[in-house]
UniProtKB/Swiss-Prot annotation:
Gene symbol of the encoding locus: secA
Region annotation (Disordered) ranges: 836-902
Name by which UniProt lists this protein: Protein translocase subunit SecA
Listed Basic and acidic residues bias regions: 840-863
NCBIfam families associated with the record: PRK12904.1, secA
Binding site for Zn(2+): C886, C888, C897, C898
Catalytic activity of the protein: ATP + H2O + cellular proteinSide 1 = ADP + phosphate + cellular proteinSide 2
Keyword Secreted: no
Annotated positions binding ATP: Q87, G105, E106, G107, K108, T109, D512
Subunit-level organization: Monomer and homodimer. Part of the essential Sec protein translocation apparatus which comprises SecA, SecYEG and auxiliary proteins SecDF-YajC and YidC.
Membrane topology of the entry: Peripheral membrane protein
Length: 902
């Protein structure tokens, strides 16, 4: 009550932010007349002037009013489009490293040109990140003439480009591209074998379009580069035959009463669990097939991999549906993005799930993969010095943006008032009744010449509805992953009078639906359009546009509520752009997934008791509130999953930063002989300690064992027993020095034989090869650790703390093994000439260039307690001093821990 009173008197925080920014808008507007008087050449010269002023110490904030005014004037001349005041406000919010929530049709693409130009003046590179290749190419081509007029270069970064093309794209002042491609390039750069193979520059400034889709929806799915591992396709086929023999237990066991099924399903977390009866049955089936020994348990160390195969097969059959979660195309299983409804070719589920789905569908089973490199979007985007984003729907997730990325959300006012009529939801008992009501609504709109966009949450729903409309002979277009290629044409026609378009979720997002149809696409179809033809097309469009406005604008029909309110709002947001007329309504049934999981049987029974007749619907604010509460529950759970994923990945991220930073230093240094000497000293000291314990009596020394070990690891025979017999005063310290000196001399002789430059090159090649191999193995070990870490909760231990402790131990062990490997290889190998070095480099390149897959992992709920506090975004990383605490969290000094490698 009191907070509402204060808001009314002083305005909300958002209102105050907008009010302050409007002062700068007034300054920009005041410059317009002055800039209009400039010639094209004088306007172009402004870029060089701004760069000079920036180099002389002026900040970008000082240049902002003039720079924005110049971009607006250039846009008027090049594109014939003038930035509205709300777009100037949005540009300022983006420059400040915040999220601008701008409604559909408010011109986000044009808004992004303002901060992109301003930050592009630094020459450090600006990344404009979109959700798909089509939008990246479209926006780059649309804005290229504007930026080139102002003297800035534009690049486009999409999949399938050659390394040289990628380099050129990244060297540009402004680079458009997809979130996946920027992330994969970062991982590839950190797998490069030479500096020349790297393409990215240091990450400076990024504007993320559809920021909610990229930083929220896709944040649960890490980017993974993987390579093929062992072939186990026969095992998947064998286990696939077992699933039909297992029975579902409809209800959980109650108060010790044993159920009558083999497994249970948890729809909320997309998991299956074997019952005690199911475990016994699976063991019998595996024994029959000769996969485990008689009497062996499913949970024994030898059978634990079989257990993961069984769970993968059960999930594939019972939780993943064809045409909802994936499609089968050309003998291949292709994942469907649950948020956009698009097919994601090339992406695969991990942990054997994709192979299990392939076995279920009877298509070719591709090999499992080994992770070579991975990063979450949360940790990738936090590498940028400044991160900003824009979307039509961010306010519902403002807390998550702030707590995880440190990004404030500012809601932009619309250029024209919003007049869309958002009607209350209608809830029916059955799906059949719901679809009948939708049909009546569509027919009514079509008769009045009102275009309709029907949003579904899966391909299956869109095809069911399409079949329903075909029976009624209603002409319509379908926009889903199966018709991805025709997307642009379907969207451009969606605003025509009486047109019915069915779209999965937010397919076609990023492209505005223009009332009356898109006249630009009509002009583009003509080879050499004359002014008269264009005028005719525009006149015809104006008649259609006015007819659609009179009919009520674009009508949105939602066939189901999504688990996120934001995605429902995105669907609604397709209508009512730029003050246009429009309307929206959601039709629900008690059979819908969200209603079934959260409303349950109680509400269905209540509706039946109320004596609802067939075709009758409930329409009440209470129902809307109940649905919103259900959505909030799902959103809260998904937020916990993302936050938890981040906390676990932060542990790996600290290690990733250490490894990648040392790898980059290795690439940049021509001579790493000092590092090799230090490593050799450490390894040798540890080996000697094992056989000659520090400050121990000579009688306790294992001298023959030490001689044998040195022969094995360093290929050097030292007569230590003879040295001790010849010199009674050869104590421990002097003996150590003599051994180290002898090993060093042997290495020096190798250097003299081969040549200094050849050995330096060989050292670097071996160091890189060993580091990459150990890092891959470490990633696999970390994966296995995380999969089972939640079980520590049963032992009253905090899974996260246990994960941190054990992952640090694994990391320390990896560094030690790496040192031993490097020293051992360099000591043993016989390098005769430069060709040997080239052979090692070529061998490494071949292994690195083996077929790779770029994918999003299907993330499980990692278990453990919910994190107490979220990590706030750090925009820059200070250099870690050798005596500072190690960033990996061990509590040791950096030089005694991860810094040992350096």
């Amino acid at each position: 009550m009191i907070s509402n009173l204060f808001t009314k008197i002083f305005g909300s925080r958002n209102d105050r932010t907008i009010k302050n920014l409007r002062k700068t808008v007034a300054l920009i507007n005041a410059l317009e007349t002055q800039l209009e008087a400039l010639s094209d050449d004088d306007l172009k010269a402004k870029t060089a002037e701004f760069r000079e002023r920036y180099d002389n110490g002026q900040s970008l904030d000082d240049l902002l009013p003039e720079a924005f005014a110049v971009v607006r004037e250039a846009s008027k001349r090049v594109n014939g489009m003038r930035h509205f005041d709300v777009q100037l406000l949005g540009g300022m919010v983006l420059h400040q490293g915040r999220i601008a929530e701008m409604r559909t049709g408010e011109g986000k693409t044009l808004t992004a040109t303002l901060p992109a130009y301003l930050n592009g003046l630094t020459g450090k590179g600006v990344h404009v990140i979109t959700v798909n290749d089509y939008l990246a190419k479209r926006d780059a081509e649309t804005n290229r003439p504007l930026f080139e007029f102002l003297g800035l270069t534009v690049g486009c970064n999409v999949p399938g480009m050659m390394p040289q093309q990628k380099k050129q794209a990244y060297v540009a002042d402004i680079t458009y591209g997809t979130n996946n491609e920027f992330g994969f390039d970062y991982l590839r750069d950190n797998m490069a074998f030479s500096i020349d193979e790297r393409v990215q520059r240091p990450l400076f400034y990024a504007v993320v379009d559809e920021v909610d889709s990229i930083l929220i929806d896709e944040a649960r799915t890490p980017l993974i580069i993987s390579g093929p591992a062992e072939d186990s396709s026969e095992l998947y086929t064998e286990i696939n035959t077992m699933v039909p023999l297992l029975e579902l237990q409809e209800k959980e066991d109650e108060e010790g009463i044993e159920g009558d099924g083999d497994f249970t399903i948890d729809e909320k977390s997309k998991q299956v669990h074997l019952t005690e009866r199911g475990q016994i049955k699976v063991e019998e089936l595996l024994t029959e097939r000769g996969l485990i020994a008689e009497g062996d348990s499913l949970y024994s160390a030898a059978s634990i991999t079989l257990l993961s195969h069984v769970y993968a097969a059960l999930r594939a059959h019972k939780l993943y549906q064809k045409d909802v979660d994936y499609v089968v195309k050309e003998n291949e299983v292709i994942i469907i993005d649950e948020h956009t409804g698009r097919s994601m070719e090339g992406r695969r589920w991990s942990e054997g799930l994709h192979q299990a789905v392939e076995a279920k569908e009877g298509v070719n089973i591709q090999n499992e993969n080994q992770t070579l490199a991975s990063i979450t979007f949360q940790n990738y985007f936090r590498l940028y010095e400044t991160l900003a984003g824009m979307t039509g729907t961010a306010d519902t997730e403002a807390f998550e943006f702030q707590s995880i990325y440190g990004l404030d959300t500012v809601v932009m006012p619309t250029n024209k008032p919003m007049v869309r009529d958002d009607r209350a939801d209608l809830v029916y008992l059955t799906q059949e009744e719901k679809y009948e009501a939708i049909l009546v609504d569509i027919k009514d709109c079509q008769e009045r010449g009102q275009p309709v966009l029907v949003g579904t949450i899966s391909i299956e729903s869109s095809e069911y509805l399409s079949q329903f409309l075909r029976k009624e002979k209603i002409k319509h277009n379908v926009l889903n992953a199966k018709f991805h290629a025709q997307e642009a044409d379907i969207v451009s026609d969606a605003g025509l009078p009486g047109t019915v378009t069915i779209a999965t979720n937010m397919a076609g997002r990023g492209t505005d639906i223009v009332l009356g149809g898109n006249w630009h696409s009509e002009v583009e179809k003509l080879e050499n359009p004359t002014d008269e033809q264009i005028a005719e097309i525009k006149a015809a469009w104006k008649i259609r546009h006015d007819a659609v406005i009179d009919a009520g604008g674009l009508h949105i029909i939602g066939t189901e509520r999504h688990e996120s309110r934001r995605i429902d709002n995105q669907l609604r947001g397709r209508s009512g752009r730029q003050g246009d007329a429009g309307s929206s309504r959601f039709y629900l049934s008690m059979d819908d997934a969200l209603m079934r999981i959260f409303a349950g049987e109680r509400m269905t029974n209540m509706m039946r008791k109320l004596g609802m007749q067939r075709g009758e619907a409930i329409e009440h604010p209470w129902v809307n509130r109940a649905i919103e509460n259900a959505q909030r529950k799902v959103e809260a759970r998904n937020f916990d999953v993302r936050k938890q994923l981040l906390e676990y990945d932060d542990v790996a991220n600290d290690q990733r930063r250490v490894v990648y930073s040392q790898r980059n230093e290795l690439l940049e240094e021509g001579d790493i002989s000092e590092t090799i000497t230090v490593i050799r000293g450490d390894v040798l000291s540890n080996i000697i300690d094992q056989y000659i314990a520090p400050q121990s009596l000579a009688e306790m020394w294992d001298v023959p064992g030490l001689e044998e070990r040195l022969k094995q690891d360093f290929l050097i025979e030292l007569p230590i027993t003879q040295w001790l017999a010849d010199d009674n005063k050869l104590y421990e310290e002097k003996l150590r020095e003599r051994i180290e000196e002898s090993v060093g001399q042997a290495y020096k002789q190798k250097e003299e034989m081969v040549g200094d430059s050849v050995l330096r090159q060989f050292e670097k090649a071996i160091m890189l090869q060993s580091l990459d191999q150990h890092w891959k193995d470490h990633l696999a070990a970390m994966d296995h650790l995380r999969q089972g870490i939640h079980l520590r909760g049963y032992a009253q231990k905090n899974p996260k703390q246990e994960y941190k402790r054990e992952s640090f131990e694994l990391f320390a062990e990896m560094l030690e093994n790496l040192k031993i490997d490097v020293v051992s290889i360099l000591s043993k190998v016989q390098v005769r000439a430069e060709e040997d070095v080239e052979k090692v480099e070529e061998q490494h390149r071949k292994s690195e260039n083996a077929p790779r897959e770029y994918q999003h992992e299907e993330v499980e709920h990692v278990g453990g307690e919910a994190p107490q506090s979220a990590t706030v975004m750090a925009r820059s990383e200070p250099k870690v001093g050798r005596n500072d605490p190690c960033p990996c969290g061990s509590g040791q000094k950096f030089k005694q821990c991860c810094g040992k490698l350096k």
